[in-house]
């Protein structure tokens, strides 16, 4: 356990609550102390939800610590069952309930005797799983529970739909542009003449989960949530799955070709090559843009990419393959799936960083001095401090990345959105020169390119004036090299002589 200024992935119970509150008519009860119940406020604000978030906190207080939790938790489950009539109540453990070593499964068994709906314990280890792993496990658990139940009752319809059909797995509340991606994926499937059988968990009913085996295949657009479910459906019902994220022109085409490969042996006779060519050459603007003079201005510019596995890997490939941008570092905070990430990005970037320490990422950005960053909300803060533009491409995100307008990242419309984001994230050539000549609207002194600590060295007036004369795009590098030279020689104040000596020492 560590004290963190910033967490990229939240604790396990947040992942479980995201899944439970994505379903329709499912209620979650969280056994937690006051303070752990911020999920309701966060979801209502960020998703701009009109309905109340279906989560109740069963508060661990001094009475509970004195008398035990069973009575209170069971009463809360039965009361919510009576008041809300949900199809399912999910009891969510937290780190507190783990510390108290309470037998929550026993509480669930006890509550099932009095509740009309189903009651399920989210079986996630709070100290081993983070938000994303817990979301994946909880989704799998709910689907397995209902498919097992339907099998016992003989209600599963395993007969496939007449036309090719798909289950889209992993669209959740509080996901990065998930609601927009959902619409775009439905549109893409319609263009491919594929019916959408079920979308889970977002806005899905647990009563419809027994229909999942009717689909011809499963599509998992995000690696973080849904893969465990897809593997279970493959092993249990022989349902193939496609886990290629359709983000960017190349990967969208690869995803569509994989879908063709999966459905043709099942009786379809489709050839999507003409569709891919039409979309790539005429419908999507991204392929045309990547050959335009505007995009050629970006060729060779340096960028850093950081985020979850899905978005960071896809963005790295788009920048390197489709836009000719030099990715100096690609990173992810999904340490549990590091091998897959390395395999995906290693040929498209200079350096791979697997870390959930925001300080390490900030220092790497300061060291590399890219022209733009593509990351999470935290990298946006880092970019503001270093005066480097940042495009947000992955969660965690703030409210400006839950846009009211239509902004998918997947599919062919997603390629247009990404092209806009990339182009608008870089400071363009003429803008650079004008800022250099006129100083922009800002009269800041030298920007310190460091995150962990501010400079401990004193620059005298002449050296500072000389530093200001150096063009902005190399100023940070000159400043850093000079300070390194001074520290190595225990020089306390940087003068013009020190600057020139430092310049000679690096052979500039």
UniProtKB/Swiss-Prot annotation:
This enzyme's EC code(s): 1.3.7.7
Gene3D superfamilies: 1.20.89.20, Nitrogenase molybdenum iron protein domain, Proto-chlorophyllide reductase 57 kD subunit B
Matching InterPro entries: ChlB/BchB/BchZ, LI-POR_suB-like_C, Nase/OxRdtase_comp1, P-CP_red_C, Protochl_reductB, Protochlorophyllide_Rdtase
UniProt xrefs under CDD domains: Pchlide_reductase_B (cd01981)
Keyword Heme: no
Cofactor, how bound (note): Binds 1 [4Fe-4S] cluster per heterodimer. The cluster is bound at the heterodimer interface by residues from both subunits.
Highest taxon above the source species: Bacteria
One MF term in the entry's GO annotations: metal ion binding
Position of the signal peptide: none
Pathway: Porphyrin-containing compound metabolism; chlorophyll biosynthesis (light-independent)
EC main group: oxidoreductase
Cofactor(s) demanded: [4Fe-4S] cluster
GO biological processes: light-independent chlorophyll biosynthetic process; photosynthesis, dark reaction
Amino-acid positions noted as binding substrate in the UniProt annotation, renumbered to this chain: 429-430
Pfam families: Oxidored_nitro, PCP_red
Subunit structure, interactors included: Protochlorophyllide reductase is composed of three subunits; ChlL, ChlN and ChlB. Forms a heterotetramer of two ChlB and two ChlN subunits.
Entry's family note: Belongs to the ChlB/BchB/BchZ family.
PANTHER family found in the cross-reference section: LIGHT-INDEPENDENT PROTOCHLOROPHYLLIDE REDUCTASE SUBUNIT B
Entry protein name: Light-independent protochlorophyllide reductase subunit B
């Amino acid at each position: 356990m560590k004290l963190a200024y910033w967490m990229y992935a939240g604790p396990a119970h947040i992942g479980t609550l995201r899944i439970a509150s994505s379903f329709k008519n499912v209620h979650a009860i969280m056994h937690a102390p006051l303070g752990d119940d911020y999920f309701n406020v966060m979801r209502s604000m960020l998703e701009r939800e009109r309905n109340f978030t279906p989560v109740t906190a069963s508060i661990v207080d001094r009475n509970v610590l004195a008398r035990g939790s069973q009575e209170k938790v069971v009463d809360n489950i039965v009361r919510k069952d009576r008041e809300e009539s949900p199809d399912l109540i999910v009891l969510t453990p937290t780190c507190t309930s783990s510390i108290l070593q309470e037998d929550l499964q026993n509480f669930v068994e006890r509550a099932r005797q009095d509740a009309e709906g189903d009651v399920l314990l989210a079986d996630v280890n709070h100290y081993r799983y983070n938000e994303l792993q817990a979301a994946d496990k909880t989704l799998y658990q709910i689907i397995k529970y209902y498919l097992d139940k339907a099998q016992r009752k003989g209600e599963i319809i395993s007969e496939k739909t007449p036309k090719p059909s798909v289950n889209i797995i992993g669209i959740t509340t509080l996901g990065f542009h998930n609601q927009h991606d959902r619409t775009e994926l439905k549109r893409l499937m319609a263009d491919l003449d594929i019916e959408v059988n079920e979308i889970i968990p977002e806005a899905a009913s647990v009563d419809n989960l027994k229909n999942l085996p009717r689909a011809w295949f499963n599509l998992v657009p995000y690696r973080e949530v849904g893969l465990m479910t897809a593997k279970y459906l493959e092993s249990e019902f022989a349902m193939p799955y496609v886990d290629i994220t359709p983000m960017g022109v190349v990967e969208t085409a690869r995803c569509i070709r994989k879908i063709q490969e999966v459905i043709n042996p099942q009786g379809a006779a489709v050839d999507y090559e003409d569709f891919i060519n039409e979309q790539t050459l005429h419908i999507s603007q991204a392929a045309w843009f990547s050959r335009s003079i505007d995009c050629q201005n970006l060729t060779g510019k340096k960028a850093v990419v950081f985020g979850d596995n899905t978005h960071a890997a896809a963005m790295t490939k788009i920048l390197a393959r489709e836009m000719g941008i030099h990715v100096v570092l690609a990173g992810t905070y999904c340490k549990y799936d590091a091998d897959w990430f390395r395999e995906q990005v290693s040929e498209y970037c200079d350096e791979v960083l697997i870390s959930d320490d925001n300080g390490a990422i900030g220092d790497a950005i300061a060291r590399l001095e890219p022209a733009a960053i593509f990351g999470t909300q935290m990298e946006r803060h880092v970019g503001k401090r270093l005066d480097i533009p940042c495009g947000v491409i992955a969660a965690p995100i703030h409210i400006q990345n839950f846009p009211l307008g239509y902004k998918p990242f997947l599919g062919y419309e997603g390629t247009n959105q990404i092209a806009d984001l990339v182009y608008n994230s870089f400071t363009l050539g003429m803008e650079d020169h004008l800022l250099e000549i006129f100083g922009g609207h800002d009269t800041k002194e030298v920007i310190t390119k460091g995150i962990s600590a501010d400079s401990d060295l004193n620059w005298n007036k002449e050296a500072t004036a000389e530093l200001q004369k150096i063009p902005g795009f190399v100023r940070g590098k000159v400043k850093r090299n000079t300070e390194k030279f001074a520290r190595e020689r225990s020089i306390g104040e940087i003068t013009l002589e020190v600057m020139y000596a430092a310049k000679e020492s690096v052979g500039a």
